[in-house]
C-alpha cells in the first residue's frame, strides 16, 4: 500500500514539474508553480526558511521522502531503473556506502557556493539537472506537437492553437545537458539510485538527517529467513541481509522492498531511539546488465539531438528568403561590455549568486529574449539578447516563475521603472547615414519615448533625421535594437547595467 501511494505521488510530482518546463503559454504556472518552489536548493537560495524547515522535518519524521516523491530527478531515475531492468528484472545487490565520495562531492559543492563558482553549483543541483533536460529535449517535442495541431486547426479555419518557433538557444548547454542526462540514465539503468547516493549533494544532506528519522524501514531478525528478496529489489543498494541492517542514510524510502517480503520481516516502522545501522559487508560483484538496452537509450538521445538540429537548420533556411524576392540576413548579437539580465534580478551579481540555471525562466519567456549564457562565470544562467524579440514592458513572466529568488517578483508598474541597461547608437551602421534613407524605426517603437529624431546636420533642419538617446529615460527593453532594420548588426543596441537602477 505504501509503495503504491509513493509511486502515485511521485509520478504526479514528476508530471507537474515536467509540465512547468514544457509549457510556453504561462497558463500552467498559476496552478503548478509551487512545485518548483518546494525544491531543496531553490528554496535554500531564495532563503525560504519555511520550505527548508518543512523538508528537514519531513526527513526527520519519514526519511528521504523528498528523494522518492518530490525530487523530479529522483522519480525520473526510478522510471529509468524500471525500464533498464526489463522484463527479467535483473536484481540489485548490496554495496558498501561510498561515504568519502558522497561527502567529498558535498564539500566541493559547499565550497563552490562560498567561492561563487556558480557553474559547478548549477551542474550538481538535481532539480536543475532535470529542468535543463526537460527544457532542452521535452519542450521542443511539446512545441512541435503544438505546431502540428496549429497547422491542422488552421486548415479547418480554427485558431485555437498558434505556431511557435523552435530554435536552439545554446549548443554548449545542450552538450552539457546531454552528457549529464546520459550519466544519470546509465547509472540509474545499471544500479538504481547510485547518482543519488554518490553524487547528489541534496541527497547527501538529507541522508544525514534520515539516519535519525522517527519512521524507518527496519528488519525483524526473528522473522527474516535470509531470502534476500528485499535486497534484490532495493534501488539504493542499502540492505545488508546478512547482518539484518539497512543504511538509513542511503535509503530513499521507495518502499519497493516492503511488498517483496513474504514473511513480514521488513517493514516501515516507528524507530525512535534506534540508531540507523551501518552495514559493513563487502560489496558483492554487480550483475552485468544488458548492453543493448544502454545502447538504445544513448542512441535515442543522439537521435533526439540530431532531429532538433535538423529542424533548426530547416527553419533557418526557410526564413532566409522574403517571398523569394530578397535575402533576409539574420541579426547578430552585438558585443556588450556588460550582459543584460532580467528586471527583478537587481543586477548581475545577485542573479549569479542565486540562480541554479534550471531554465524555467527561459522556457517561460514568451518574447524569445532569454537564453542560457555561454560565459564561464555565468554558464547556463539566463541573460537577455534582442535578436528575436524584445522585453515587453507589460511582461513579468520570468519574475513570476523563478523559484530561487534570482529574479524577484515584480509587477508591471515596477518593471516600467527599472533600468536594466541603456541604448547606444552606432553612427556607422545607421541607415539614414549609410543609405541616405529616412528611418526612425527605433524612435517610433520606444515604449518610454527615450529616443527622439534630430537633424543629422545641426545647421540644416531639413537634413535626414538620426536618433538621439536619452539614457536617463531608457529602461533597456531592447525594442529599438530588435526593430532596427540594419543588418547584420543593429545600429542601436542595449548595453547592460551591472546593477539595475530605479528611475
Model regions and ranges:
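Non-ligating segments of multi-cofactor redox enzymes
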Residues: 1-244, 249-250, 256-503
Amino acid at each position: 500500500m505504501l509503495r503504491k501511494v509513493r509511486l502515485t505521488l511521485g509520478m504526479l510530482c514528476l508530471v507537474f514539474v515536467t509540465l512547468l518546463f514544457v509549457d510556453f503559454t504561462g497558463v500552467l504556472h498559476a496552478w503548478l508553480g509551487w512545485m518548483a518552489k518546494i525544491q531543496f536548493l531553490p528554496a535554500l537560495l531564495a532563503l525560504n526558511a519555511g520550505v527548508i524547515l518543512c523538508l528537514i522535518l519531513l526527513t526527520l519524521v519519514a526519511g528521504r521522502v523528498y528523494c522518492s516523491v518530490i525530487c523530479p530527478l529522483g522519480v525520473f531515475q526510478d522510471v529509468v531503473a524500471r525500464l533498464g531492468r526489463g522484463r527479467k528484472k535483473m536484481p540489485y545487490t548490496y554495496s558498501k556506502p561510498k561515504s568519502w565520495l558522497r561527502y567529498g562531492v558535498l564539500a566541493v559543492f559547499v565550497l563552490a557556493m562560498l567561492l561563487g563558482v556558480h557553474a559547478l553549483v548549477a551542474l550538481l543541483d538535481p532539480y536543475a539537472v532535470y529542468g535543463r533536460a526537460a527544457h532542452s529535449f521535452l519542450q521542443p517535442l511539446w512545441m512541435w506537437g503544438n505546431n502540428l495541431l496549429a497547422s491542422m486547426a488552421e486548415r479547418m479555419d480554427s485558431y485555437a492553437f498558434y505556431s511557435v518557433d523552435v530554435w536552439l538557444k545554446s549548443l554548449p548547454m545542450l552538450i552539457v545537458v546531454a552528457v549529464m542526462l546520459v550519466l544519470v540514465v546509465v547509472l540509474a539503468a545499471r544500479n538504481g539510485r547510485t547518482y543519488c547516493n554518490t553524487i547528489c549533494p541534496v541527497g547527501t544532506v538529507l541522508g544525514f538527517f534520515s539516519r535519525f528519522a522517527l519512521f524507518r524501514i527496519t528488519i525483524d531478525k526473528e522473522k527474516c529467513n535470509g531470502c534476500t528478496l528485499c535486497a534484490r529489489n532495493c534501488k539504493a543498494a542499502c540492505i545488508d541481509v546478512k547482518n539484518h541492517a539497512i543504511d538509513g542514510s542511503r535509503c530513499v524510502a521507495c518502499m519497493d522492498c516492503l511488498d517483496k517480503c513474504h514473511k513480514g520481516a521488513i517493514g516501515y516502522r516507528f524507530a525512535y531511539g534506534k540508531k540507523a545501522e551501518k552495514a559493513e559487508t563487502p560489496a558483492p560483484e554487480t550483475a552485468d546488465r544488458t548492453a543493448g538496452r544502454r545502447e538504445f537509450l544513448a542512441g535515442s538521445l543522439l537521435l533526439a539531438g540530431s532531429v532538433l538540429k535538423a529542424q533548426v537548420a530547416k527553419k533557418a533556411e526557410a526564413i532566409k528568403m522574403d517571398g523569394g524576392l530578397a535575402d533576409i540576413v539574420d541579426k547578430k548579437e552585438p558585443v556588450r561590455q556588460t550582459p543584460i539580465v532580467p528586471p527583478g534580478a537587481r543586477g548581475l551579481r545577485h542573479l549569479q549568486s542565486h540562480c541554479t540555471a534550471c531554465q524555467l525562466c527561459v522556457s517561460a519567456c514568451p518574447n524569445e529574449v532569454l537564453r542560457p549564457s555561454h560565459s564561464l562565470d555565468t554558464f547556463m544562467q539566463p541573460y537577455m539578447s534582442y535578436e528575436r524579440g524584445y522585453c515587453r514592458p507589460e511582461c513579468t513572466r520570468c519574475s513570476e516563475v523563478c523559484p530561487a529568488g534570482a529574479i524577484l517578483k515584480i509587477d508591471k508598474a515596477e518593471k516600467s521603472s527599472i533600468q536594466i541597461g541603456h541604448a547606444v547608437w552606432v553612427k556607422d551602421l545607421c541607415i539614414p547615414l549609410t543609405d541616405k534613407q529616412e528611418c526612425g524605426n527605433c524612435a517610433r517603437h520606444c515604449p518610454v519615448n527615450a529616443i527622439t529624431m534630430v537633424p543629422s546636420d545641426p545647421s540644416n533642419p531639413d537634413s535626414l533625421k538620426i536618433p538621439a538617446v536619452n539614457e536617463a529615460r531608457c529602461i533597456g527593453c531592447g525594442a529599438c535594437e530588435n526593430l532596427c532594420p540594419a543588418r547584420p548588426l543593429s545600429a542601436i543596441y542595449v548595453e547592460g547595467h551591472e546593477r539595475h537602477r530605479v528611475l
